[in-house]
Amino acid sequence: MKIFIFYNPLKLSNDDLEENILKPFNESNIEVIGYAAAGSTVEEKQAQVADFFVIFGGDGTVLKIAEIAAIFSKPVIAVNTGNLGFLSSYSSSEIKELIEDIQKENISFSFRHLLECHVGTKKVVVLNDIVLLKSQPLGTMNVDVKIEEHTLFSFAGDGLIVSTPTGSTAYALSAGGPIIHPELNVVQLIPLAAHALNIRPFIAPPTQRIEIILKNMSKGFVYVTGDGDIIHRMEPGMSIFVTSSEMTIKLAQRNGNNYLNALDKKLGFGRRFE
């Protein structure tokens, strides 16, 4: 069994990496063929021969690895060394259990759908969301959203979230969107602070292309972000296109700990408040 390790250097020191992660794996029959900080360049040969990508960090670290995992079709096992760790199946204190589960093949995987954002000649692939945000705190942006040439939204507001089901428990949830089971293949659109009573979140099919047109701004310009990273600056009259990607990633879920368990344990979803 061969693994490649990605880690967040802000959450994991070199000493911790050597002593608490690399050493236990090296003492098992699991070969660590390489390791790298999330976001750094990885040799294609190493990525291809790995059986799994094992990620040490928070949810943001998982998001940084999503595209490369999809490109090389490598299952992802996430170990939380951050805060919430909603996408993680193991905590940093469960390295022994992780090694045993890998050895015994006691891990199942769920397929997570991705989004593609096309900006000019650039294509960006994300696991959570594409977001349009104002550069200035005051004022509004005027946006048209089209699905296959049909105008779905035309509104003034603070921005727009285009989310995957996996991203429905991230920014989209805070903005009033529904929780969508991650194994569904749909695209969610959530206007941010739309100045209209008739503008509400909308769930679109994955087969249709979404065009987002920035008509005008009262102040500043618009940032386009992909999983939290700025990928483009929009000026009035510009468009971007978002589609569901044909690529997916396989994200580990510990046997007995499915998505509904994670909602309960990490978000407190469905609990009655006494």
Curated annotation (Swiss-Prot):
Listed InterPro entries: ATP-NAD_kinase_N, ATP-NAD_kinase_PpnK-typ_C, NAD/diacylglycerol_kinase_sf, NADK
The family this protein is said to belong to: Belongs to the NAD kinase family.
Keywords from the UniProt entry: ATP-binding, Cytoplasm, Kinase, NAD, NADP, Nucleotide-binding, Transferase
Compartments where located: Cytoplasm
Descriptive protein name: NAD kinase
Superkingdom of the organism of origin: Bacteria
Alphabetized GO MF terms: ATP binding; metal ion binding; NAD binding; NAD+ kinase activity
Reactions listed under catalytic activity: NAD(+) + ATP = ADP + NADP(+) + H(+)
UniProt GO BP: NAD metabolic process; NADP biosynthetic process
Organism this protein belongs to: Petrotoga mobilis (strain DSM 10674 / SJ95)
GO annotations of cellular component type: cytoplasm
EC number(s) per entry: 2.7.1.23
Enzyme class (EC, first level): transferase
Record PANTHER family: NAD KINASE
Cofactor(s) of this protein: a divalent metal cation
Pfam families: NAD_kinase, NAD_kinase_C
Purpose of the protein: Involved in the regulation of the intracellular balance of NAD and NADP, and is a key enzyme in the biosynthesis of NADP. Catalyzes specifically the phosphorylation on 2'-hydroxyl of the adenosine moiety of NAD to yield NADP.
Residues that, per the record, bind NAD(+): 59-60, 64, 128-129, 158, 169-174, 193
Major localization listed first in the record, in broad terms: cytoplasm
Catalytic site: 59 (proton acceptor)
